[in-house]
């Protein structure tokens, strides 16, 4: 499982959780600040798998 941070059409941030075979498992709500999305990802990683990769497509 890994996370991909993206930007929505209204310039807010969201992330998708993808499985090892690259299928989307879940999509988050949108966040005004990228830091908010990152904090949510960290929270999920603590509960599931802290070694999950995060790919930031917004940079």
Predicted regions and their residues:
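Short arginine-rich
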Residues: 44-54
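A structural feature that tracks compact, well-ordered secondary-structure segments
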Residues: 2-44
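Short, tandemly repeated low-complexity microdomains enriched for cysteine and small residues
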Residues: 26-31, 52-58
């Amino acid at each position: 499982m890994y996370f991909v941070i993206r930007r929505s059409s209204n310039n807010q941030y969201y992330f998708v959780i993808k499985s090892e075979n690259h299928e989307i498992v879940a999509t988050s709500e949108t966040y005004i600040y990228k830091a908010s999305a990152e904090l949510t990802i960290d929270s999920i990683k603590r509960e599931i798998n802290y070694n999950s990769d995060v790919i930031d497509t917004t940079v």
